[in-house]
Amino acid sequence: MLGANDGLSSNFCLMMGVVGGGASATTILLTGVAGLVSGSCSMALGEWLSVTNSHELAVSQADRAMGTAAPEETLPGGSSAGDAASAAFFSFVLFALGALVPLLPFALLPAALRIVGTIAASIAALFVLGLATSLFNARSPLFSGLRQVMIGSAAAAFTYGIGQAFDALARWAR
């Protein structure tokens, strides 16, 4: 769930930043695709490294404790290369699914509805993810959903504003 939230939030903010900067539809779409691919790869790599490094640390600590090299399979709860690959795969997929939320409306809707559709889909998905987090945080679903929407929307508005400021500065410098 966290990977999906990362994908949704980062791609929503990224796309709103270039929308604020007055980018063309092609540039906005390319930015969304690049955000999806680069973010998914980054999440997968980070997850693989995290699981692999944790496993290597456990092996190293077991070696020191026993004063010898411990076979990996004797470690309690030890991770394997398969665990790292599986974690990386799921991080990649979850991030990509989240990143698709702002991207698909922009890609599929008529020009007049692209930005509104992207914002609406992203806000709806933020709310749903917030509802889902209420299963784990002992907060009410409404509170969790609205909090997620407020934070995600504020971040997207901030990047939109940065895009507008950059566009204004670029126009002034001409």
Model-identified regions with their sequence ranges:
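Hydrophobic, small-residue-rich transmembrane alpha-helices and their short perimembrane loops
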Residues: M1-V101, A112-A125, A132-T133, A155, ...
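Short helix-capping/hinge motifs at transmembrane helix termini and TM-loop junctions
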Residues: G21, F106-P110, N137-A138, D167
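Short amphipathic alpha-helical leader/targeting segments
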Residues: V59-S60, S144, F166
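Selective transmembrane alpha-helices of multi-pass membrane proteins
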Residues: S122, I151-G163
